[in-house]
């Protein structure tokens, strides 16, 4: 149901009111801006180092785009599918460790000792809260500026990093080059949502060329327009000007988004940037091809992706076995479409050709 506002207008023969220019509508907010580049520095408080990027912000980017989340989830799923549980490392702990390593650039496992002081199990420690200590081998659990703080014993936390060329205290995720593309994609989606919630237009200019009776009439119009804020905010308004002209009042749209729409181009280009950063075949994360030839066979793309991307990640993760001193992590054979086998052998992998 719409609301009608009636604004009375006095005798137009009176002295004309002075010209008034009034802007209305809230500025469109954005998720993040270029200031994120200012975070690339490190400092310590005497006990632990702070990361070069806020870990809370980095965690929030996990959901900035379906392409980014799907690419991360694909790698985690392939690792989890091949991981074999051991007495020291559960599937759940490994999955959380793998997700942290790929999204946050750091994966942590805590050494849980038994009564004899030997390894009972390795448990996941969240990268969001772990901070390397200033003292070598020491780590801290920090739950925000005012939250709980826990100091781990020296040698109780295993850290696996994605190397960063600027420093060696924290790892940085290699997909970071596509961060701005992901945020651009999200901003484009948020703008489009606001466009539809705004009545399918991007704002307009209320142009009034009629001579009004007095300044109070212009103020009344301004007040009624200023009340049109928020979702479902547009109201009907009756303006009666005796002897007025046909085009005395005009509503002129600022932009016709339906006619000049860059939304699809922005989404496509930002998607390509993210897929390039993740080196992920598009058919493996549900992207529909727009060409007649398609993307090729999914199985062949999966095999190539596993060999070129998943195997190097798994090799890095196998370093935990040497650190813990036990075969903590192991991977099952991966059977390729052509019958060849990618098999773990010690801390590496070997491809056994079919036949």
What do these predicted ranges mean?
Residues 107-109, 137, 202-204:
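Generic beta-strand structural signal
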Residues 127-136, 140, 147:
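A short alpha->loop->secondary-structure connector
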Residues 2-12, 75, 80, 142-143, ...:
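Extended, charged amphipathic alpha-helical segments
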Residues 1-132, 169-172, 257, 294-297, ...:
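Flexible, gly/proline-biased loop segments at the beginnings
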Residues 119, 137-140, 249:
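Hydrophobic residues embedded in beta-strands of well-ordered beta-sheets
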């Amino acid at each position: 149901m719409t609301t009608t506002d009636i604004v009375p207008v006095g005798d137009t023969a009176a002295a004309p009111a002075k010209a008034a220019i009034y802007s209305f509508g809230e500025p469109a907010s954005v998720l993040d801006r270029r200031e994120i580049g200012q975070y690339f520095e490190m400092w310590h408080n005497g006990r632990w180092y702070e990361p070069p990027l806020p870990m809370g912000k980095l965690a929030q980017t996990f959901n900035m785009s379906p392409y980014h989340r799907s690419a991360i989830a694909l790698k985690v799923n392939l690792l989890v599918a091949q991981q074999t549980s051991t007495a020291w490392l559960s599937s759940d702990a490994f999955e959380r460790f793998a997700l942290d390593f790929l999204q946050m650039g750091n994966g942590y496992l805590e050494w849980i000792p038994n009564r004899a002081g030997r390894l009972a199990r390795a448990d996941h420690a969240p990268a969001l809260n772990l901070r390397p200590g200033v003292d070598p081998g020491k780590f801290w659990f920090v739950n925000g500026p005012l939250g709980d703080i826990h100091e781990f014993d020296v040698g109780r936390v295993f850290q696996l990093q994605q190397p960063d060329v600027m420093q060696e205290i924290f790892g940085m995720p290699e997909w970071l080059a596509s961060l701005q593309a992901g945020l651009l994609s999200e901003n484009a989606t948020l703008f489009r949502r606001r466009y539809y919630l705004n009545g399918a237009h991007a704002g307009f200019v209320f142009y009034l060329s009629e001579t009004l009776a007095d300044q109070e009439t212009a103020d009344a119009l301004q007040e009624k327009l200023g009340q049109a804020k928020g979702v479902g905010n547009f109201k009907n308004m009756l303006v009666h000007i005796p002897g007025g002209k046909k085009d005395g009042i005009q509503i002129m749209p600022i932009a016709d988004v339906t006619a000049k729409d860059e939304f699809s181009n922005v989404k496509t280009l930002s998607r390509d940037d993210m897929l390039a950063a993740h080196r992920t075949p598009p058919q493996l994360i549900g992207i529909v091809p727009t060409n007649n030839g398609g993307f090729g066979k999914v199985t062949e793309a999966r095999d190539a992706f596993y060999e070129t991307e998943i195997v190097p990640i798994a090799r890095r993760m196998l370093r935990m076995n040497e650190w813990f001193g036990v075969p903590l992590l192991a991977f099952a054979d991966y059977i390729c479409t052509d019958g060849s086998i990618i098999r773990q052998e010690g801390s590496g992998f070997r491809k056994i050709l079919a036949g």
